[in-house]
């Protein structure tokens, strides 16, 4: 999948060149992958509830079917993502896009300095940065085969959602292009998990060699995960740190690495 460093690079280029930013979430992406007929067949039990719907699985000769053979990828199949990306990458190359040697999930096409496009693929999510008519042309090309999810794209005027991150590009009164990244849902979840900040917390500098996994004692009591789910908290913090809160990423990574 697309690395977060590549995502930041794409957003920096959008700032430098005042380029358009779009986000597309592919609807039912994994269902578009096709299984190779030469691979061993994948047998499936008929889904529960077919009898209640009045549907009885049958073979071509009319006998009752006790299993199905999958012909295309489905959600839950281990290689569904791989099959989808193989098909989708072929689709991207059909638009004249080339695969980056730096990040295989970054695709680009440059016609000239005023017409270029970058497409970052993160599973079934696409981040698009470009100038000129190529962005519109690609969206029309995309609609010819795939369908966009209803909850993807522009959330509010000028604000696009990508991987749960709100991306807003704006121009200041001095003509400076800036991008704001935020995620109200993740921050709301963090507040629900953490509650009010305890008053007895002590700030410590994360210097080299500091011991973070201090054994439990009277002064350092062990707190149940039912009271405070530390793993979930630092999972959200790490995502926030890698995606847009770069200032707290180092601290979160150091603490998360000491969790056992």
Language model segments and positions:
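Long, low-complexity, charge-biased intrinsically disordered regions
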Residues: 1-260
